[in-house]
Amino acid sequence: MDETATSSEVTETFVSDPTTRQFEEDGHPPLETRHLNMIHEELEKLNISTDVINKMEVQLDLARADFRETQVQWSEKLKELSKQYSSQIAKARPFYELKIKERSLREESQKAAERFERATSILGIAKQQVSLTQESLSRQTSVLPECLEVLNHHIQRVREVEEERTAAESLHASKAHAMLHLAEKIRAMEKDNRYAIKKSRLYFEKRLEFTKILEAQKATILCLEAEVRQKKNDYTTSLRNLERISERIHEERSTGSLESAVSSDQEDQKSDFKSSESLPGNPPPYAPTAPPPYEDKYIIDKDDDSIVLNMIKTEQEEEGEKRNSRSLGSGVILLAQQLIGNGNSTEKHNITPPRHGEEADISYHTRPVGLSDGSDNSEVSSLASFNIGDDDTVSKMLMSHSELIKDIELATDRVGHILKPNIKSVSNAHE
């Protein structure tokens, strides 16, 4: 107990003193958090075990002192009674010994009776199982070996329970016979020593009370001793855990010193490599980036469904008819302009004036409102870039209003003759 108290004081001072946690005096780095947590946990267990051991040992000492005091007090009382009734106690002692023996026989007989009753109930259940199994086998046309095995198991169980029942019955009978024989002896002794038994009754009653008190105190002492033994085992386990943690810390530090030396060499190599990489060098060569390839989002693959292609074709034909009917007048005018341009192309090729800056490329587009750019020559007329020179050149290119109207009428007639067969083919296709 003193050693445990001193160890508890040492552990408490270790926990309370923060300077002992620092390892700077030995030249070691501070402990990691997980190691500190493990050490703190084991030290808490040590402190708790020490407190419990100290309290239980105090209780154990008190219980032992009470046991000794009770034993001394009752021994003195029994000695006084034995001196007072010495002759009567000597005559009545065999009677009370037989009474104690009778009590033990009664308890054994009670246990044998309970065993017999239990075996009887189990035997009834086993016999019922055997009868049910036999009935089920009698209803079957072909008896399976598994069913026979179950029946044999139930029969074997019945035999075992019958043997248990017979043994319990014989034991109960023997205990009952012994009790009857002992009861006859007790009656005979009580008849012969009635006066001595009556005088010494106080002594034996006090002795029985004294025995009960001592047995209770003895049970308390044994319980406290078992608890103290368990807590001491916990204390030694915590000490061993602390030793393991200390060994682990030393191993990690020894391996960590080697790893730190290797890592320092690697870091030096990396720093040298980074310093060599940090030197300025020539810029990378120029790599021109090409524009992204043209992607036609409206191209239809050949593997597409033929139904979709037919629908698109019919829609395109309907839109073509609408455009032809809607832009007939505008198309006539554009064709007339093209014819006029073709008629004057000879004169344009002969004239090659110099080009000037922004006026060198001029295109004229005349298309109906709402139509998009496409490959249809009837809707878009792109005049070649006119080279504008002096006033004489401009005057040759211009025409009077009346001549332009006549040319437009002639172009209209030509377009009418050209479009008639196309319109007929379209109508036949719709039909």
Swiss-Prot record:
- Which Gene Ontology cellular-component terms appear in the entry? cytoplasm
Start and end residues of each stretch annotated as Disordered: 1-28, 249-298
- What are the boundaries of the signal sequence? none
Q: Which UniProt keywords apply?
A: Cell cycle, Cell division, Coiled coil, GTP-binding, Nucleotide-binding
Q: Which residues form a coiled coil?
A: 149-171, 214-247
Any one GO molecular-function label of the UniProt entry: GTP binding
Q: Which GO terms describe its biological process?
A: cell division; intracellular signal transduction
Name one matching Pfam family: SH3BP5
Q: Does the keyword Isomerase apply?
A: no
**Compositional bias ranges of the Polar residues kind:** 1-21, 255-264
Task: Summarize what gene deletion causes.
Answer: Viable. Double knockout with rei-1 results in a smaller brood size, weak embryonic lethality and severe mislocalization of rab-11.1 and prolonged cytokinesis in embryos.
Q: Where is the composition biased (Pro residues)?
A: 281-293
Q: Which domain of life is it from?
A: Eukaryota
Instruction: Please give the subunit comment from the record.
Output: Interacts with rab-11.1. Binds preferentially to the GDP-bound form of rab-11.1.
Query: What protein family is recorded?
Result: Belongs to the SH3BP5 family.
What role is this protein assigned? Guanine nucleotide exchange factor for Rab GTPase Rab-11.1. May spatially and temporally regulate the distribution of Rab-11.1 to target membranes during embryogenesis. May play a role in cytokinesis, probably by targeting rab-11.1 to the cleavage furrows.
Question: Can you say what this protein is called?
Answer: Guanine nucleotide exchange factor rei-2
